[in-house]
Amino acid sequence: MVILFDRFNLPKDVFEIIFSTPQQKIVAKELIKYLIDNKGEISKTIMSVFATKLHEGQYECILDDPPYKGRTVKLSYNKRQFYDRILTPMKSMGLINYDLYKKTYTISAKFSNDLLEIGLMWKHELRKMGAQV
């Protein structure tokens, strides 16, 4: 996944930087809340139940964003698109970790660590090219 951003106009919400549509942002944020509510770890089966509830429009939550702030709403999101556009990118970027042995999803800090490493790689490349950084 590619993250393009304008450093002078960064949104306050990191989900707006990572995900391209408001609906993706809402679903990704709800997934993280769901993981937190389940002690930061859920099984593959529970993830499938979450995706199915979204697909059937039965997932209820209270949103933090206008115009639905504070209201209980039912979210609907296609199951295939959930896996393709939300879960898979979150795994590949290090926001969520999947343990192949335990078959569980957990919240991960790898994303933050990788961004720091990318910044260091950028500085190293500039120095290698002769720039004073």
Residue positions per predicted region:
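Long, low-complexity, charged/polar intrinsically disordered regions in eukaryotic proteins
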Residues: 1-40
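DNA-recognition alpha helix
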Residues: 43-71
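Conserved interaction-surface patches within small, structured recognition/assembly domains
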Residues: 69-80
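Short, hydrophobic-biased segments on the C-terminal half of alpha helices
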Residues: 79, 84-88
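A short, conserved structural fragment
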Residues: 87-102
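Minor-groove-contacting beta-hairpin "wing" of winged helix-turn-helix DNA-binding domains
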Residues: 102-109
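Short, amphipathic alpha-helical interaction segments positioned at domain boundaries
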Residues: 110-133
